[in-house]
């Protein structure tokens, strides 16, 4: 049958054990009791607490214990030693279907793997240039380590200073956004520190606002240890998660009254993540990346997405092992081994999803280049961005048809 790789099953078991913790106040399902509104009467609070406690103890914990026991005694011994789904009897066909679903293209795993290798080589060359520019003598791998630990890139003493730095980035790009975008969202935007209860495990992320404007879009930044916070990728991160990345794209889609609801709230990762990754390349046009370390941060994030093309296809169509994928990543990017291991296991668990970012970015960049070449002096970057954003997410083939039609009109 189709079972998870052993290395993933091992990671799942403690999660079920945690959900079955006998210490009721530490149980996730008890959290609602801790945040009951002050307006509730003492009697109501007492009644709800008793009912929640009984439900958790009598219904939920026994089921989680049962599931954890099944995973340990039955599922783990039957889990597979291979890392990718290509090893399953129907795995190659299944992976090809996932690739089509996540990239919204007809590209094959072999084509994507080759594209990834070429992009990794190109970006390695760009990273070497930055390394030489700052006068670092040593290998690129040594430079990765140097950047990760450089004290000047960890200047913050208070979490508020991290948020203030993002506000500063926002103030730098604000005057330049109008030069690239005529179509901009009305939804308000805020930068906030990630809430304490999830900060230790969260990534920086964008949380979309309400379509009616009642709630702003929020860029959340986790700062679990401010003294260890490295700022070298912050300019790039802001463009991707906030403006003009996810905040622009998602807000414009939700605000678009001409779209039916199923399209206002729809999502195609190749388009949505492709757009966010494309906006990282706009940094210089928006007044950023003047510091070589910030530019290196952009290259590092793009490299991370290029590596995904290689390792995802390697794992699921070429028989790569988990260890092989980790080794390839460690040799080509500045992430820690712990972070890379988590990423590789994510690719093992969700085949094809990690391909969407880079495939989408490259398609949008290719369409921009095509429009510039065919339209010449008639090309208007603001109009190009409007055409890409105005109809919301869609498969990349449809986006290409839309841009081709716009080019033909001119």
List where the protein language model places each region.
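N-terminal maturation segment of proteins
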Residues: 1-410
